Amino acid sequence: ILPGQLHHILLRGNNDQPVFVDDEDRQAFRQILGEAARQQGATLHAWLLLPNRVHLLVTPREERALAAVMQTLGRQYVRCFNTRHQRSGTLWEGRFRASLIEGARFGLVCQQYLERLPVAMGQAPTPAHYLWSSARHHLGLEHELGLQPQPAYWALGNTPFEREAAWQTRLAEEALAQALAEVHPHLA
């Protein structure tokens, strides 16, 4: 883990089991994630919640920041999930996986991959329709406190409208194949 560098984080459900049963679980996770990132010194750039896994793009400000964020999630979210669903035991498949993302262009390709993945998996017709990712923020449909776009995202245009339109184009179907080919082999 390198401070000041973009990382892709992957958390998988133990034995591919669901880690979210309903929207209340997803909302609780988002709240805990936002607070943990803020308190532990990590900048959250993009996120995706799928039924059995979580993808994050995060820049830690200190060496231990990512581990501290994940530890907070492990303690608080798992306790919340287990209590709500009257279960016990582990929720996650071992330790989180982290991959260093080098280069601004590659960071945007990773974000494109994450925000387009629900469409590729048949979870939504477009990224804008999937409520549990950062795509709606980057497309200008919602404003999410605590989410800070990567510097390369800011370079997509001079105004929010230009950036959002450029991002919409990047999330278009034609761009997906290239993004998948570039990113998939390198993610955790």
Give names to the regions the model predicted.
Residues I1-L50, T59-A188:
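Short Pro-Cys-Gly-centered "Cys-loop" motif that presents a nucleophilic cysteine in a tight turn
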